[in-house]
């Protein structure tokens, strides 16, 4: 049964060398959204992948009107890819904008619950670190680094969010319109922290939905030392950012966490 959504859903999937994952991911997302959100679009944002991901995305788009492709001339970072996609989706009339990875780390089966949560929230976070969430197929060191990074960001910024670094989210249109995307400075995964923090600064209602994060099925991880270092210095810089003008949360509801 379709959800009572007030507008179109756009799912943004950034890609760089994700040829092995893209076709099954698009099929899985379509299977989840066809019934609950018939008015949906999957926007693949490809940074000129040398493995031919962009060409494959074009073929998928040619065969399916629910798929579109945004080509970028070079690899410029996760943040700029998402910002370009957000603007594209907003210009096309999106009411809900989903961001998710292409490698099945973010299971499309969570989309119905996250979209349902977005009916009375402004930003929904797929959270690994609330009750019911977790990670699979990670080694001890990666678990420590991830947990430590979330604790560091949460403590430094003073926000009641368990998973600030996750990249599975649903934005209501108003959040992306209110945030000055030109002010976003992060290039890598610090982008996730920065967007959520700015939404909280502005008084938007942010909720967390538990997810199980699974290590990628195929391909290579995009995590690098430079990405980790950017996150380390960006968090204190965000703390010094003057509060933005506050905006009333959706429906005037107080914040809560799922």
What would you call each of these model-derived segments?
Residues 20-24, 51-60:
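Acidic helix N-cap motif at the loop->helix transition within catalytic regions
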Residues 46-55, 104:
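A conserved acidic beta->alpha catalytic loop
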Residues 22, 29, 85, 103, ...:
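Residue-level signature of catalytic and energy-coupling elements of molecular machines
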Residues 68-91, 96, 108-189, 216-231, ...:
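Acceptor/aglycone-binding surface of glycosyltransferases and processive sugar-polymer synthases
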Residues 38-49, 70:
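Short beta-strand/loop segment that forms part of the nucleotide-sugar
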Residues 1-7, 158-159, 181-258:
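Hydrophobic helical membrane-anchoring modules
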Residues 1-31:
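N-proximal low-complexity "stem/linker" segments adjacent to membrane-targeting elements
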């Amino acid at each position: 049964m379709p959800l009572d959504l007030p507008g179109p859903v756009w799912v943004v999937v950034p890609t760089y060398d994700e040829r092995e994952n893209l076709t099954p991911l698009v099929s899985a997302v379509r299977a989840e959204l066809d019934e609950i959100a018939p008015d949906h679009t999957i926007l693949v944002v490809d940074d000129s992948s040398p493995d031919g991901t962009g060409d494959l995305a074009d073929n998928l788009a040619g065969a399916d009107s629910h798929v579109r492709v945004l080509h970028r001339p070079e690899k410029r970072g996760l943040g700029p890819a998402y910002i370009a996609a957000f603007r594209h989706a907003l210009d096309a009339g999106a009411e809900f904008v989903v961001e998710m990875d292409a490698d099945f780390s973010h299971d499309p089966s969570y989309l119905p619950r996250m979209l349902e949560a977005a009916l009375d929230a402004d930003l929904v976070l797929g959270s690994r670190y609330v009750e019911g969430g977790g990670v699979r197929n990670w080694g001890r060191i990666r678990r420590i680094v991830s947990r430590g990074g979330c604790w560091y960001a949460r403590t430094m910024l003073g926000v009641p969010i368990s998973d600030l670094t996750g990249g599975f989210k649903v934005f209501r249109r108003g959040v992306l319109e209110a945030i000055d995307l030109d002010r976003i400075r992060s290039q890598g995964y610090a982008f996730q922290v920065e967007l959520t923090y700015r939404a909280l600064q502005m008084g938007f209602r942010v909720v967390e939905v538990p997810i199980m994060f699974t290590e990628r099925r195929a391909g290579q991880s995009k995590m690098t030392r430079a990405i980790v270092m950017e996150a380390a210095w960006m968090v204190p810089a965000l703390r010094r950012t003057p509060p933005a003008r506050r905006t009333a949360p959706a429906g005037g509801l107080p914040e809560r966490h799922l």
